[in-house]
């Protein structure tokens, strides 16, 4: 990299987390008969009923004491160890007329038919990590749908997988970051955590994490604080989080004109309430980059009588203000335990984001930009 007298950052931001269930500190619940259940709580806004009757694994981190040290160990069970069983229709005749699961009752995962007792959970985790149960001092463990991803359809045009939101954007952003060549400016790949629960953590988009990292990069390049602020003013962030494709059975849930389809191209999202960070300037810049890279784009806006969510760009800009655009891949069944997107959109995103990273943008305030 050859940094000039002045420089700027070109960033993508995605998030690594998805809605699921987190294991509570006291993890076991007795069930009917000899059964043992897992004591969990919801992480994020999931579609509850999609978690029924799927064998589930455990993944996360465990804090283990080794003498005078506390070490973090990653854990991902290689087999399914829990399931959330449905109540048979014979015992719930109205289930197909509208069923709202109670997370404290209906969504408790079954982990044993009688072989395990209260207190055995940590022993099982310790065995997975080859440590003693008393060495475990803390854990952040979550239920995981281990169902394999599938490319399917008569033309192999669909991809279905857990965690498509937002690992599709994390993957395509990372591939673009690794494959792009830009010798003059600072390319940054940022993947936040905890977006699904509000981003208000030390590793979330509302934290100082990104701003702190950019400031340290600025210092390592030999620039002063004034140069840092000038760099931010000339920088651009592409906030990457998936978008709702028009549902084949529920077109009425989308705006009549600003709706997007699978395999129709990368989505540029806008909202008058600024929950998406796109404005005319950032849209124009990203649109021009996509046009030059021969990548189709789609415009998304929420239906005017429906509230939409927010994502990363407007939140991270609270700590490190810069030009930003919200984009994503179109998908169906967002926040289901198994989601569906378009195969071609993955390729479109890699091509568009690679072109973004490789473009030496020269931003002159909010008035013009040299591509």
Explain the meaning of each model-derived region.
Residues 4-371:
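N-terminal hydrophobic/helix-forming segments and targeting peptides
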């Amino acid at each position: 990299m050859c940094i000039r007298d002045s420089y700027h950052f070109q960033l993508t931001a995605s998030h690594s987390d998805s809605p699921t269930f987190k294991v509570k500190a006291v993890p076991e619940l007795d069930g009917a008969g000899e059964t043992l259940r897992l004591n969990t709580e919801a992480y994020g806004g999931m579609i509850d009923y999609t978690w029924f009757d799927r064998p589930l694994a455990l993944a996360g981190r465990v804090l283990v004491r080794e003498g005078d040290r506390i070490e973090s160990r990653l854990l991902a069970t290689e087999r399914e160890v829990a399931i959330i069983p449905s109540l048979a229709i014979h015992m719930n005749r109205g289930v197909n007329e509208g069923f709202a699961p109670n997370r404290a009752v209906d969504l408790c995962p079954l982990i044993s038919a009688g072989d395990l007792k209260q207190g055995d959970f940590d022993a099982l985790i310790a065995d997975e990590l080859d440590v003693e149960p008393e060495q475990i001092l803390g854990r952040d463990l979550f239920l995981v749908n281990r169902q394999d991803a599938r490319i399917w359809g008569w033309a192999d045009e669909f991809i279905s997988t857990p965690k498509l939101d937002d690992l599709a954007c994390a993957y395509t952003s990372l591939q673009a970051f690794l494959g792009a060549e830009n010798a003059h400016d600072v390319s940054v790949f940022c993947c936040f955590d905890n977006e699904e629960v509000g981003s208000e953590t030390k590793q979330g988009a509302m934290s100082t994490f990104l701003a702190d990292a950019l400031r340290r990069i600025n210092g390592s390049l030999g620039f002063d604080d004034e140069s840092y602020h000038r760099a931010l003013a000339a920088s651009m962030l592409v906030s990457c989080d998936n978008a709702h494709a028009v549902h084949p059975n529920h077109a009425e849930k989308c705006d009549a004109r600003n709706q997007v389809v699978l395999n129709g191209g990368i989505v540029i999202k806008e909202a008058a309430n600024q929950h998406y960070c796109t404005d005319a300037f950032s849209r124009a810049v990203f649109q021009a980059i996509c046009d030059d890279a021969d990548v189709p784009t789609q415009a998304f806006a929420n239906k005017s009588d429906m509230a939409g969510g927010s994502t990363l760009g407007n939140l991270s800009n609270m700590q490190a203000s810069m030009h930003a655009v919200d984009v994503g891949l179109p998908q169906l069944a967002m926040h289901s335990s198994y989601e569906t997107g378009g195969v071609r959109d993955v390729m479109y995103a890699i091509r568009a984001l690679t072109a973004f990273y490789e473009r030496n943008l020269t931003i002159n305030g909010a008035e013009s930009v040299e591509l």
